[in-house]
């Protein structure tokens, strides 16, 4: 049975929990405004990766889960492929080779060493190979090494050649049978068709055309009457009439069919499939059998078999054994198509089962499945093994039977190459997004419809990209990229899981006779369509009864209506069940427009880790689980007492007497150049529980995700400096390093063997002053701690130059001074243009130390340079609601607007950024941020008791101290009336004054004049993120640099150290102002007049006047292009004479030719004698 069923044992009371994070020991107490009790913990957020890989390698943990699910004798992915392949027989069938029992040895090196030394984190794979000589019955068994197999780390990633990569799950159309409906343009008739799509093999398509005949296409070849196929399968006219007598169109198709009997039908099919080949009955029979009924050639896959059985009502209660088509499948498919065309709504199959007759929606999640990491790797291994199978067969025929052993037959190269190719080059094996922990977590939970066997951006239409009702609780409707991939790449919802068939399931609470139970059933999209589902916030009493007579529910296709409580089958487990992790971290999501929420979810992944992380005052309760599951914090494995704490490690003495040492990552570089640093948050002698966070990572505080900073924001225009989403910042954020981040760059150089001799890493560099070498050590490598700027030498290296024949004097010098006099050139590693920082690490690998290095490389040096980037004009900031902007001005603290108690605001945002974008969540966050920062106390002791607005709040929320952290979960957070009440109940400051009014606004004073602004301004605390789009990475200037070889114009872009293009529109602007000489200069001597450039430089150096410009190189290129199109283009002077366009090289050529006495003019000499 597909439905997973678990019983959630709830330890919470029936009321909402006021404190989140209770399930994790030692977690900070975040006060929650949630009204609803969630009966189910959020599942492991990396399970989609880890469980799939466990299935592939047949891990014990997976076997236990499969057995608990009720699977009998579960088979792992590798085992499955080897079973499919075995036995490999030779062409005569006299010998065979079988494989079984895949197993792994220990991994070769730990994760850190693999990253350090550019190795792959892999374990050797061994299988048992058994060779059987069928003639003699002799069996030879051996354990065979099948190559190093990349293993998944605990975090769900792979280390390939030292870089961390993620394999993204792929969304594909499931194998199965799909019925479709279309309108014929000429006759406006409704036509129906059906495709039988296998996992591997030929497609089988049936359709009813406008002439009302039923046809079949085999393997996308020409259409034939469907009765030809039935006859080829051995059916007689009488049998066809008996089964399909109810259908006029089948009878008319039979009448038009001219084939008589099985043999003729087989030959007819053979002629269509193999035109030009002489047909025989045997070859036709074999062809048809091979196409659809032989496992080697046709594979529906288990999921395809399951889908076909389910759709056509066949053998639904029997376990799935075969994965080929059967004759009954073909017949039932034809009957279903015919009944669909004549308008029937149900069909009774031979077993007496009734199935609904309807067309399929291919975008429905019942028809789209996930290929997770395990299946993707399994498919790649299958490709490698099939290549190996060919080699084995060839060797069986060529080698001596007596001498054959499994080892001599097997060549593992194709398998190893296939695995390497997948991890190294596949579209689905991606360089891990390590900007911050959330970006890594989201990357592992990504669902992509692109990739091999999937869609392509160009062909994907609107329907497949659109949000579908079956996505509910399975794929997030919010989080998807902007741009050409919109809708093709999604993110798994928080509670979703993947079942053994690859379909995404989501959990629901079972409702029995109008009573909501704590039993949890996981449903696929197909199963959900058969049920009536109530929403998570439907009011319940303490016994679980619906308090209202009519309950709002949804049915198939997302249709919403009110029904009585007894009709309800299931209820959502949580209001955040439909969204992904990143979206679930947006507070007040319910008040944001979806387009802006999409930007908010995506921009959280671009936040850079700051020097000091700060958890949000206003969170959603998702921060803790996201940070722990992302794997960048250190979690205690066992309960115990902390023995020793330092910056580099924590030692815990566990209760069972074992000692655990947890090592910290210190200032490591992530894939995106951000700084990954871990620091302990426990003290020596402190007791820790199992699962408790003992050290923070990047972007975390006390184990919670902390992507940005809580800043005091004023929402108002300010002198036009925050026009069009520009942002005004206080200089305090610069001085106090509030928004400062550390970025680490890796620079690498290797010393190789060249044809002229070996390169050498040395301090002895020709033509370099001592000041330049000051920071290099005796090896020629920069010292740790050195401040470096662009152009500084990091590693000195010299490369031998090509040498001419030495004179006797030079030979004497060489004999006296040795290698010193050798000709070398400086090829040192220098800091790239525009970069600077402090050297924080050096790694040296050399052959002498037995380090593994690529062929021809003797030594390799890596230098890590860290840069501390303060916030500056041009950097991009954003909130969590899609409210993004670029810093337009950084004001001195004294000029910033300030509150009546003298507190200056940190950041000023423009009011225009809110109304038309409809992301009101940012305003509500600002209000609640102020409430959390100031603290509150609801007056419940007054005459009226608890105010009306606070009736739904738990007692724990009646008061809170200042600097409290709160959670407002998505779709279940603080209401507007509660916010108004809390704003009126905030605690006064130390002077006894309340700064912000009940409406969330405060009187602000202008920092420059001290005068109050004429209107109250919304002031509060907003969580602001510093994004990866930093101005330091974008700003660029060039004086001299590289040119394009063809056009002789400077290259473009920062990466090429290019120039600024003076384009077509800029030329128009110059023309409009009549600046003819400026324009001429720009188009010639400042750009691509090669001769003029040199002359101008010479004139400037000598202090002479600038000479006349020449002809630009691009003009010559244009002439050449026109001439290549066979157009005779000539350049005429003012008096009409043709001007010869020659390249500078041509002039040199002519001069050389004249010296040699060769004539290069058009009237060439007729013979060699004429030259003499």
Curated annotation (Swiss-Prot):
Give the main EC class. transferase
> Which EC number(s) are documented for this chain?
2.7.7.6
The biological process GO terms on file are: DNA-templated transcription
Q: Which residues form a coiled coil?
A: none
One of the Pfam families matching this protein, by short name: RNA_pol_Rpb2_6
Q: Is Kinase given among the entry's keywords? A: no
Keywords assigned by UniProt, alphabetized: DNA-directed RNA polymerase, Nucleotidyltransferase, Transcription, Transferase
What's its catalytic activity? RNA(n) + a ribonucleoside 5'-triphosphate = RNA(n+1) + diphosphate
Q: Which top-level group of life is the source organism from?
A: Bacteria
GO MF entries: DNA binding; DNA-directed RNA polymerase activity; ribonucleoside binding
Checking CDD domains in the record gives: RNA_pol_B_RPB2
What start and end residues bound the annotated signal peptide?
none
What are the record's GO terms for cellular component? Answer: DNA-directed RNA polymerase complex
Record text on subunit structure and interactions: The RNAP catalytic core consists of 2 alpha, 1 beta, 1 beta' and 1 omega subunit. When a sigma factor is associated with the core the holoenzyme is formed, which can initiate transcription.
Family the UniProt entry places it in: Belongs to the RNA polymerase beta chain family.
Query: What is the recorded function of this protein according to its Swiss-Prot or TrEMBL entry?
Result: DNA-dependent RNA polymerase catalyzes the transcription of DNA into RNA using the four ribonucleoside triphosphates as substrates.
Q: Write the protein's name.
A: DNA-directed RNA polymerase subunit beta
């Amino acid at each position: 049975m597909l439905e997973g069923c678990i019983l959630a044992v709830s330890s919470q009371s029936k009321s909402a929990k006021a404190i989140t994070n209770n399930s994790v020991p030692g977690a900070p107490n975040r006060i929650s405004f949630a009204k609803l009790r969630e009966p189910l913990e959020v599942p492991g957020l990396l399970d989609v990766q880890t469980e799939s890989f466990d299935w592939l390698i047949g891990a014990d943990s997976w076997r236990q889960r499969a057995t608990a699910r009720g699977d009998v004798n579960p088979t792992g992915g590798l085992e499955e492929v080897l079973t499919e392949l075995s036995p490999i027989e030779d062409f005569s069938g006299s010998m065979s080779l079988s494989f079984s029992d895949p197993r792994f040895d220990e991994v070769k090196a730990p994760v850190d060493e693999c990253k350090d030394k550019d190795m792959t984190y892999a374990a050797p794979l061994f299988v048992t190979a058994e060779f059987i000589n069928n003639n003699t019955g002799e069996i030879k068994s051996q354990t065979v090494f099948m190559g190093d197999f990349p293993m998944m780390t605990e975090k769900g990633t792979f280390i390939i050649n030292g870089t961390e990569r993620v394999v993204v799950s792929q969304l594909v159309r499931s194998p199965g049978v799909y019925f479709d409906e279309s309108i014929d343009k000429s006759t406006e008739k409704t036509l129906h068709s059906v495709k039988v799509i296998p996992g591997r093999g030929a497609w089988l398509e049936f359709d009813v055309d406008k002439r009302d005949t039923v046809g079949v296409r085999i393997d996308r070849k020409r259409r034939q009457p469907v009765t030809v196929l039935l006859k080829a399968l051995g059916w007689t006219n009488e049998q066809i009439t008996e089964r399909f007598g109810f259908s006029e169109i089948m009878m008319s198709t039979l009448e038009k069919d001219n084939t008589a009997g099985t043999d003729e039908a087989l030959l007819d099919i053979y002629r269509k499939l193999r035109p030009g080949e002489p047909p025989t009955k045997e070859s036709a029979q074999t062809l048809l059998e091979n196409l659809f009924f032989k496992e080697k050639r046709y594979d529906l896959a288990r999921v395809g078999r399951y889908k076909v059985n389910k759709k056509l009502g066949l053998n639904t209660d029997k376990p799935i054994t075969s994965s080929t088509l059967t004759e009954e499948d073909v017949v039932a498919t034809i009957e279903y198509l015919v009944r669909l065309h004549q308008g029937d709504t149900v069909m009774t199959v031979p077993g007496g089962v009734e199935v609904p007759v309807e067309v399929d929606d291919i975008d429905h999640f019942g028809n789209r499945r996930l290929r997770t990491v395990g299946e993707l790797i399994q498919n790649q291994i299958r490709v490698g093994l099939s290549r190996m199978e060919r080699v084995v067969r060839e060797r069986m025929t060529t080698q001596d039977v007596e001498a054959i052993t499994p080892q001599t037959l097997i060549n593992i190269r194709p398998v190893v190459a296939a695995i390497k190719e997948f991890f190294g080059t596949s579209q689905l094996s991606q360089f891990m997004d390590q900007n911050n922990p959330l970006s890594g977590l989201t990357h592992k939970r990504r669902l992509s419809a692109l990739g091999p066997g999937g869609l392509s951006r160009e062909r994907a239409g609107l329907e497949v990209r659109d949000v579908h009702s079956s996505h509910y609780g399975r794929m997030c409707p919010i989080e998807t990229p902007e741009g050409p991939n919109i809708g093709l790449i999604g993110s798994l919802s928080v509670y979703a899981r993947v079942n053994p068939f690859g379909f995404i399931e989501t959990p629901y609470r079972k409702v029995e006779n109008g009573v909501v139970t704590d039993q949890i059933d996981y449903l696929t999209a197909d199963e959900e369509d058969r049920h009536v589902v109530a929403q998570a916030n439907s009011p319940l009493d303490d016994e679980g009864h619906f308090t209202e007579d009519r309950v709002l529910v949804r049915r198939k296709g997302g249709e919403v209506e009110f029904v009585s409580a007894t009709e309800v089958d299931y209820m959502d487990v949580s209001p955040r069940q439909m969204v992904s992790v990143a979206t679930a971290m947006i507070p007040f999501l319910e008040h944001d427009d979806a387009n802006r929420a999409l930007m908010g979810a995506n921009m959280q992944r671009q936040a850079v880790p700051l020097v000091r992380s700060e958890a949000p005052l206003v969170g959603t309760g998702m921060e803790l689980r996201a940070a722990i599951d992302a794997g960048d914090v250190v979690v205690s494995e066992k309960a115990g007492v902390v023995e020793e704490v330092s910056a580099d490690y924590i030692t815990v003495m566990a209760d069972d007497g074992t000692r655990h040492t947890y090592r910290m990552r210190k200032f490591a570089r992530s894939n995106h150049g951000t700084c990954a640093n871990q620091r302990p948050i426990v003290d020596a002698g402190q007791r820790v529980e199992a699962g408790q966070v003992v050290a923070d990572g990047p972007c975390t505080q006390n184990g919670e995700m902390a992507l940005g900073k809580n800043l005091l924001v004023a929402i108002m225009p300010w002198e036009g400096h925050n026009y069009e989403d520009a942002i005004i910042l206080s200089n305090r954020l610069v001085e106090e390093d509030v928004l400062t981040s550390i970025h680490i760059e890796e620079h690498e150089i290797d010393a190789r063997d060249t044809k002229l001799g070996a390169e050498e890493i040395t301090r002895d560099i020709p033509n370099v002053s001592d000041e330049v070498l000051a920071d290099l050590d005796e090896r020629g490598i920069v010292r740790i701690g050195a401040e470096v700027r662009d152009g500084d030498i990091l590693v000195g290296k010299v490369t031998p130059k090509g040498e001419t024949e030495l004179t006797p004097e030079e030979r004497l010098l060489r004999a006296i001074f040795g290698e010193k006099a050798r000709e070398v050139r400086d090829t040192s590693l220098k800091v790239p243009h525009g970069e600077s920082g402090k050297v924080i690490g050096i790694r040296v690998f050399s052959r002498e130390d037995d380090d593994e290095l690529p062929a021809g490389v003797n030594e390799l040096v890596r230098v890590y340079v860290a840069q501390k980037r303060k916030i500056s004009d041009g950097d991009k900031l954003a909130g969590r609601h899609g409210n993004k902007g670029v810093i337009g001005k950084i004001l001195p603290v004294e000029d910033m607007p300030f509150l009546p108690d003298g507190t200056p605001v940190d950041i000023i945002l423009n009011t225009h950024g809110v109304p038309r974008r409809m992301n009101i969540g940012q305003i509500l966050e600002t209000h609640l941020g102020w409430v959390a920062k100031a603290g509150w106390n609801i007056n419940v002791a007054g005459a009226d008791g608890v105010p009306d607005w606070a009736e739904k709040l738990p007692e724990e929320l009646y008061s809170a101290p200042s600097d409290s952290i709160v959670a407002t979960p998505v779709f279940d957070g603080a209401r507007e009336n509660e916010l108004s009440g809390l704003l009126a109940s905030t605690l006064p400051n130390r002077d006894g004054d309340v700064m912000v009014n009940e409406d969330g606004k405060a009187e602000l004073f202008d920092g420059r004049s001290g005068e109050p602004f004429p209107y109250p301004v919304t002031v509060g605390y907003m969580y602001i993120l510093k994004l990866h789009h930093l101005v330091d990475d974008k700003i660029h200037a060039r004086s001299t640099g590289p040119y394009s070889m063809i056009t002789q114009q400077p290259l473009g872009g920062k990466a090429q150290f290019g120039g600024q293009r003076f384009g077509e529109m800029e030329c128009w602007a110059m023309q409009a102002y009549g600046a003819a000489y400026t324009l001429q200069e720009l188009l010639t001597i400042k750009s691509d007049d090669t001769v003029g450039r040199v002359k101008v430089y010479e004139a400037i150096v000598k202090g002479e006047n600038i000479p006349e410009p020449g002809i630009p190189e691009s003009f010559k290129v244009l002439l050449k292009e026109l001439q290549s199109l066979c157009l005779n283009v000539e350049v005429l002077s003012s008096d009409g004479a043709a001007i010869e366009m020659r390249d500078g090289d041509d002039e040199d050529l002519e001069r050389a030719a004249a010296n040699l006495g060769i004539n290069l003019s058009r009237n060439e000499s007729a013979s060699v004698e004429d030259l003499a």
